[in-house]
Regions:
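Active-site-adjacent segment of SDR/Rossmann-fold oxidoreductases
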Residues: 110, 127, 148-158
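Conserved mid-core segment of classical short-chain dehydrogenase/reductases
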Residues: 54, 76-90, 131-134, 173
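Rossmann-fold scaffold of SDR-type NAD(P)-dependent oxidoreductases
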Residues: 66-74, 95, 119, 161
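C-terminal helical subdomain
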Residues: 162-163, 181-203
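Catalytic Tyr-X3-Lys loop
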Residues: 75, 82-101, 118, 142
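Residue(s) in the substrate-gating loop at a strand-loop-helix junction
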Residues: 122
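Canonical Rossmann dinucleotide-binding motif of NAD(H)/NADP(H)-dependent dehydrogenases/reductases
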Residues: 1-17
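Active-site helix of classical SDR
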Residues: 103, 138
């Protein structure tokens, strides 16, 4: 299971009501069955669909004040620079576009006050990796957006936190084992302890 699951699970254990967003309806059905309705609400859709974002955030806000937004979406694309095609670029850019749309809508419904926004990115936002040019470009874009938010809301009750984890041992690499072998993947950090560290610094 991934970092998003661990974050949701640990927040629920702490008594939070978590709204989870995913395009995978089957996975959301499993989570809805696992957790009670007063702990977890599932939203199924494309994080880059503006209408879906607006409708979902409005519904979430109707449940109460949004205290924390965690932007954790992202898909990898690991190739040599000349192998990238438009579809690869679009896939990587979904994470950046989704981050922006969910952040903007959340800030609006919160009146730009009393909210924490956690942007979970990657060490790929801090350097260039030979076979991750488009992925790194997306993550650098997320970093630039996050730093701009931090500048815009400095000294206010809007707190924007940047998180740059390295490799995590999850299914994130399931289609990339030609680049990151399963053996190497299993040397990466586990999502549970990472989620603990992130939440310790957020709540």
């Amino acid at each position: 299971l991934g970092l998003g699951y661990e974050l949701a699970s640990q927040l629920i254990d702490k008594g939070w009501l978590v709204a989870g967003i995913d395009f995978n309806a089957e996975r959301q059905a499993e989570l809805t069955a696992q957790w009670p309705a007063d702990s977890y609400r599932a939203y199924i859709g494309d994080i880059t669909d503006e209408a879906f974002v607006k409708e979902s955030v409005a519904d979430i806000a109707s449940l109460g004040h949004i205290d924390l937004l965690i932007n954790n979406a992202g898909q990898p694309s690991f190739k040599v620079p000349t192998a990238y095609e438009a579809a690869d670029v679009d896939k990587c850019l979904k994470g950046l576009k989704g981050m922006i749309l969910w952040t903007v809508e959340t800030l609006q419904v919160c009146g730009e006050r009393d909210v924490k926004i956690a942007q979970i990115m990657s060490t790929a936002a801090t350097r260039g990796n030979a076979n991750e040019s488009v992925y790194c470009a997306t993550k650098w874009g997320e970093k630039g957006y996050t730093k701009s938010l931090q500048a815009a809301y400095k000294g206010t009750s809007v707190k924007v936190v940047a998180i740059y984890p390295g490799g995590i041992d999850t299914a994130f690499y399931r289609d990339s084992h030609d680049y990151v072998s399963e053996d190497k993947q299993h040397t990466f950090m586990q999502p549970g302890p990472l989620a603990e560290v992130i939440l310790f610094n957020l709540i």
